[in-house]
A protein has these predicted regions:
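Conserved N-terminal subdomain of the carbohydrate kinase-like
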Residues: 1-32, 46-51, 201-218
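Short gly/ser/thr-rich secondary-structure transition/capping motifs
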Residues: 11-16, 59-65
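Acidic, amphipathic alpha-helical patches
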Residues: 21, 71, 140
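Catalytic beta/alpha-barrel core
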Residues: 32-37, 84
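Short beta->alpha connector loops
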Residues: 35-40, 60-64
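Conserved phosphate/ATP/ADP-binding segment of small-molecule kinases
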Residues: 46-54, 63-131
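Conserved phosphate-binding/catalytic region of the ribokinase-like
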Residues: 97-218
Length: 218
């Protein structure tokens, strides 16, 4: 379930959608631009009188195929781009994810998150790389929405802690990964809707154990 085939995309109402940001949200410090047409994402950002502390953008291969120029404009105004490995290779025309990341970060984003499904995620910033594991699950019911959940967990943690250092972004990636690991366990938002704080903490502990190792240097 690490790849997908887009058989058909119908924009329907989104093709002429004009987003209006409510006054109460125009002073937000953290902005997540969901996976919509790049021109719509840009319209949201343009309505904010003061640039947020952090702007995160999600996109996909369809926008790269059909709205490349608009996407290039949108990327210039964001801090973090989150995409999967297939999309990173398409966007950069590089197979190596390290080379892809370096090329994509010249397009505007200061940070890049490359999601690799069951193989975890990579966080890039300048010459720094953080590799986050995925939690091995015995059963995956439905991966739909896992990427959105990841993004929500990621920026939600950063907004809560109000710290956008690289070290804290590493923690945010783990938070996003943990939340996404719940989403795939049931259909839609069913699993997320029933989560308890205890379950989240236990899942985060599982991720900590995956990354913990005591090794002796030669």
């Amino acid at each position: 379930m690490n790849t997908r085939d887009t058989l058909d995309t119908q924009l329907n109402v989104l093709e002429s959608f004009n987003p209006i940001v409510p006054e109460g949200f125009k002073d937000c410090k953290y902005l997540m631009l969901g996976n919509l047409m790049p021109s719509i994402q840009q319209k949201v950002l343009d309505q904010l009188p003061t640039r947020p502390k952090l702007v995160v953008l999600d996109t996909m291969n369809f926008w790269m195929d059909h709205f490349w120029d608009d996407l290039m404009i949108a990327l210039k105004g964001v801090d973090v781009l989150t995409i999967n490995d297939e999309e990173a290779r398409q966007l950069s025309e590089e197979y190596s994810l390290v080379k892809a990341a370096q090329k994509i970060m010249t397009m505007g984003p200061k940070y890049l998150i490359i999601k690799k499904g069951e193989h975890g995620a990579l966080l890039f910033h300048e010459d720094k790389v953080f590799s986050a594991p995925a939690l091995p699950l015995a059963e995956v019911f439905d991966p739909t929405g896992a990427g959105d959940t990841f993004a929500g967990g990621f920026i939600g943690f950063l907004a809560k802690t109000d710290d956008i250092s690289f070290e804290n972004m590493k923690r945010a990636v783990i938070w996003g990964s943990a939340m996404a690991s719940f989403t795939v366990e049931k259909f839609g938002t069913e699993r997320i809707a029933e989560l308890t704080t205890e379950e989240i903490n236990l899942r985060l502990e599982e991720f900590k154990n995956l990354m913990s190792v005591d090794i002796q240097l030669v």
